[in-house]
Amino acid sequence: NLVQLGKMIFQETGKNPATSYGL
């Protein structure tokens, strides 16, 4: 789900997950 995806993105990029979604 989006929550798990967001956590993965945060761990991989070290950025705020919201920025990866363009939010």
Curated annotation (Swiss-Prot):
Its cofactor is Ca(2+). GO terms for molecular function: metal ion binding; phospholipase A2 activity; toxin activity. One of its GO terms (cellular component) is extracellular region. Expressed by the venom gland. It catalyses: a 1,2-diacyl-sn-glycero-3-phosphocholine + H2O = a 1-acyl-sn-glycero-3-phosphocholine + a fatty acid + H(+). Its main location: secreted. One of its GO terms (biological process) is lipid catabolic process. It comes from the Eukaryota. It is found in: Secreted. Binds 1 Ca(2+) ion. The keyword Disulfide bond applies. The keyword DNA-binding does not apply. Its EC number is 3.1.1.4. It is an enzyme of class 3 (hydrolase). Contains 7 disulfide bonds. Keywords: Calcium, Disulfide bond, Hydrolase, Lipid degradation, Lipid metabolism, Metal-binding, Secreted, Toxin. Belongs to the phospholipase A2 family. Group II subfamily. Snake venom phospholipase A2 (PLA2) that induces local edema a few hours after injection (5-10 ug) in the hind paw. PLA2 catalyzes the calcium-dependent hydrolysis of the 2-acyl groups in 3-sn-phosphoglycerides. This is Basic phospholipase A2 CTs-G6. It comes from Trimeresurus stejnegeri (Chinese green tree viper).
